[in-house]
Design a protein with these regions (language model features):
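Phosphate/pyrophosphate-binding loop motifs in nucleotide- or prenyl diphosphate-using proteins
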Residues: 1-175
């Protein structure tokens, strides 16, 4: 018997398995939520690949690594820890302290990694819109909902940090 690697063929009829073995339609809100977070994580990775600021890269990597278990938890991998919002809030505060930035509307594009993070932020906002539907139906716990809700704020802060470094002459700003 051959071992399956990428292709399991289990989804060929439009369903997938959650971590607990439950079969659900591939277009269920839960699958849409962790799929949207997966997309967000890929954009964060793109930003990290384009980033030349070691401290920011380290935080981007930590965020990427944190998202894996969050997606697993949402996919009902009950052995994984409940998402911890304090990690995101600490990172937001760290960036605020470093940059002195407050909320403002921005024009993405001052740097490639900053622009990639703004794409990740908009994907995180889409995840929020999916999460709220699950939350209102009592299908998503408070901690997971709060984590998804705070994720776009965290990514926004990271984009501001990168663009702040760019404006300080440590990169090339958009004219």
């Amino acid at each position: 018997m051959s071992k399956k690697w990428i292709t399991t063929k289990g989804g060929d009829k439009g369903e997938t398995s959650l971590c607990d073995g439950t079969r659900v339609p591939k277009d269920s809100l839960r699958v849409e939520l962790y799929g949207t977070l997966d997309e967000c994580q890929a954009h964060i990775g793109m930003a990290r690949a384009a980033c030349s600021y070691p401290e920011v890269c380290e935080e981007l990597c930590r965020l990427e690594q944190a998202l894996g278990p969050v997606m697993g938890y949402i996919a009902r991998c009950e052995t994984l820890p409940v998402p911890d919002i304090s990690v995101l809030e600490e990172l937001i505060e760290k960036v605020r302290t470093i940059t002195g930035e407050t909320f403002r509307f921005v024009r993405p594009g001052d740097s490639l990694p900053g622009a990639a993070l703004h794409v990740a932020r908009t994907v995180a906002r889409r995840a929020e819109r999916v999460a709220v539907k699950l939350f209102r139906n009592n299908e998503l716990d408070d901690s997971s909902y709060a984590y998804v809700n705070r994720l776009s704020d965290t990514i926004y802060a990271l984009a501001l940090w990168i663009d702040h470094l760019t404006r300080e002459g440590k990169g090339t700003p958009c004219e």
